[in-house]
Design a protein with these regions (language model features):
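Catalytic cores of histone-lysine modification enzymes
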Residues: 10, 17-115
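C-terminal SET catalytic tail plus cysteine-rich post-SET Zn-binding segment of SAM-dependent SET-domain
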Residues: 2-12, 109-167
Length: 167
C-alpha cells in the first residue's frame, strides 16, 4: 500500500504475472500473481498451493467468475457444491463459471490470505509470508444467519464453524 493525497491506496495490479502454471491448468495466469497449483488438500478435497515465496501484503490472485444477482444467488446456492462469493448487497460472483482458480482456495480460521474488494474486484492478499508448498487459505466468514457449516481447518485458532456472528 502507499499513500496518495492523504488517502491510502491499494495496489491492485500484480508485481509480476504468474506463468509456467502447467501443473494446474485450472489456475488462470491472467489473475494469478504467483505460481501456484491445485492438488489434494487435508482441509477439503482440493486446495491451491503456493509454488513460490509470496511476501506479506501482496495481491495473490483475483476471485473471478460470473456476476449474478441476489435472486440467482439464492437459486444457485441450493446446490451441494457452490463457489459463490458475495460482492455487495446486490451482486455475487459465481466462481464455478469463469473462475480464476481462487474459488478452490479453502477456508481456514487462521488463514494466510485476506480479502479486499477494490472497485468491484475481489482480491486475495497475503496476510503474512507464504512459503512454497503451503496451502493458500482464507476465512470464508459465513453469516451466522446461514445453516451452520462445520470447519475442518484444524488450526489452533479454529472456531469449529465457518460461520461467524454478525455484528
Amino acid at each position: 500500500m502507499w499513500r496518495t493525497g492523504g488517502k491510502t491506496a491499494l495496489r491492485v495490479k500484480c508485481e509480476k504475472v504468474a506463468t509456467a502454471l502447467v501443473k494446474s491448468p485450472n489456475i488462470d495466469p491472467r489473475h494469478a500473481c504467483f505460481q501456484m497449483e491445485i492438488r489434494e488438500s487435508r482441509i477439503h478435497r482440493r486446495g491451491v498451493y503456493a509454488l513460490e515465496h509470496i511476501p506479506k501484503g501482496r495481491k495473490v490472485i483475483e476471485y473471478t467468475g460470473e456476476r449474478i444477482s441476489r435472486r440467482e444467488t439464492k437459486r444457485r446456492g441450493l446446490g451441494s457444491i457452490t463457489y459463490l462469493f458475495t460482492l455487495d448487497n446486490y451482486w455475487t460472483i459465481d466462481g464455478a463459471i469463469g473462475g480464476s482458480g481462487a474459488e478452490i482456495i479453502n477456508h481456514c480460521c487462521d488463514p494466510n490470505l485476506y480479502t479486499r474488494i477494490v472497485r468491484g474486484h475481489i482480491l486475495y492478499m497475503s496476510k503474512r509470508v507464504i512459503v512454497p508448498g503451503e496451502e493458500l487459505t482464507v476465512d470464508y466468514r459465513f453469516s451466522d444467519k446461514l445453516d451452520p457449516v462445520r470447519c475442518r481447518c484444524r488450526a489452533k485458532k479454529c472456531r469449529g464453524l465457518i460461520n461467524v456472528k454478525e455484528e
